[in-house]
Amino acid sequence: MATNMDSFSGYIKIENSVFAFTLRDQIVTLLPAYSEPDQRGKALDVFSSESMKEPAFFYGHDESLHQIAFYKQSAVNQGKLGLSSSAKFSTPLIVKSAGNASGFYSKLTEEWNKFHAITFYGGNINSICDPENAIFRVRDVDGDRRVTRLEKRDLSEYTKTTKVTIGGVSADLTVSVFESPAPKNPDNPQSYSLGELNSFIRLSFTSAQDFSTIERYYTTMRILVAILTKQDNVHFEVYLSQRDLKDMYYKSAYCKIYDGSEEYLDNNTNTIISIARIFDQIPNLIQAIDNGNLNIFRDLLPKNRRDLRSISISNVQDLCTALEMAYYWSERHEEKDEYIENLKISIKKAIKEFVANNPGVDPNNETTLSSCFGYLSFTLKQRINTLYNENKEIIDIIASRNGTPNVCLETIKSFVDLRNGKTHSGIFAWNENAKLFYPLFTLVYACLLNYIGVDDETVKEIITCVF
């Protein structure tokens, strides 16, 4: 990121009061910018109103006159800073203008708190889209020396665009690569660097978007990258752009987003799903994320190095939840559910006959039949077994490769019993079939790829390559 977003000071205006602020490690401290005690007290009174408990953006500028926006999610806390009264809040999102001079603002075609495109780049995005796809190496001879020259491919060779919809808003999703200049070396000012390549995913919109939409677009992209990298602790940079009168994008702001991750991991490209392999299905994947159908992945995927090396009972519970959801992605569940509906019809018929022969008993009101009847369905072990049978060839390869127990109804039952024991009694005992976690984790991914429309052969290639 080209600008400091972790610690700085400046002024912001909240309603009709001006405050000096200091940002340090996500915490914004506010001091009323007035000398008179009465004015300072009146300024702080603004935080007592009910409206201040609602999420909002506070706008101002830093000491170098860059415009600033802090996102406030909850109430502002009041206290003391030395002898002065102050207020504090934690911000999960900071937006800072990309320029601070009149020339910068003259190029904006909308108010500064609007954008036509949001770009996510670097970090784990470089894992799912290798930036070296944009270059090729040419070997040549220079006199007596053999040299290798780097040349950039044509833009069309490493750029792809598709249509997606997020929150009811249509956008163009573009995946490509850009070159960033390297920072100057203070120890050798005359040195020359080629800079660095970063892959990016950009969402661009026909109509300008408000800052309030940043969180939704970021969350969608974060889950997308997490799914493809198979880990939740992903990272990348974010900036905003406006479209100028020549239909070119002009960088308008940088974003700093605090996601709560304790550590970040960059991936071995052999363990990730390349976005290029499923690019045609990205609109379907984005739709599933936007609908909330894939939120379980936030719990299921590892969040740090420790999670990569161990399995907890919470992981087992989350995996069972994910498998329950995956069952409803499957085409077979409709066939199975039809069986359940026919069973319910038969039960209703039997109850009707029973009541006719026993008029003094009302099963619906005098027994727990209604509640049992409402939850009539296949057991989780049967649902998982259905999914396994649909993906048997792939999952057997993964189980054999990793030396785990064979997947069958018996071992699935033993695995589900771990979840049930913890959920219902708080007591569970690890057994050999806990090792079933990895092939069943793989099964969730196979089901997801099928769900978003990846063909069977490509699913097999992806699963056997990255798991």
Predicted feature locations:
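Acidic-enriched, low-complexity/disordered segments with a strong bias for Aspartate over Glutamate
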Residues: 6, 25, 38, 45, ...
